[in-house]
Amino acid sequence: MANYLNNTPKVPSLFEEAMLGRIYDEPGENENNKPKTNVVVNATRKWYGKKSTVSTFTATAYNEQGEKIDSMKGYFLEPHVNYDSAKIANSDKAIMYGTYNIIPKAELEERINKQRRERGDEDANLRFDWYVDKVPGRSGIAIHGGRDGDDTLGCLLPGDTLEYKEQVQDYTIKNSKSKKNELFDFFKQYGKQGIKINIGFK
C-alpha cells in the first residue's frame, strides 16, 4: 500500500508523548486496582493522504477487576493532519493527538443546553450519537459514518477496509456504517462507566 508522505507531521519528543497520552495507561493501575473506564480505544495514526489521515484502532472492554473481557478493531479516517492547525477552530484538520473522553450525545447536550438556558437561548439538538470531549480549540468532534476526507472537518470516521487511490493520492474507507454501528454497540454494552480514547501515531 502506497503512502502519501508529504507534510508528514513532526514526531514529538518522548516527554511530549508522555504528557499528551501517547504512552497509554492501562486500566487497573489506579490506587484501588480498579479500572477508571470500561472501554479504552487506542488509535494509532499510520497513513497520510492528501486530504486524509488514517489510524488503526483497537477498542478494549474491561471488567470491574481491570481484566480484558472483549475487544474489536477497525480504522478511523480523519482529515489531513497539520499539528500547527490542530487546535484552531474550523481548521478542517485532524485533532491534536492525546487522550480524551468519549461521551454520549445526551451528556454533551445537557452541558451545552445548561449554558444556553442561562443565556435565554433555545436548546441545541446535536446531530451525532457520540462525541470526543474537550478537544483543545475544537468543538463538535464526533464519531460518525463517512468515506473520505471530504466527509469530515475533524471527526473520526470508522471503517473496516482501507483503500488508497493513487490517482488522487488519498485514502478512503469502506463499510463505515456497519463499523460505526458495531463500535457504538460496543460502547453501549461496555462503556457505562466511561470511555477513553488515546490517539497517537507512528
Model segments located where?
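Cell wall/extracellular polymer interaction/catalysis modules
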Residues: 14-173, 177-195, 201-202
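Hydrophobic, membrane-inserting alpha-helical segments
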Residues: 1-12
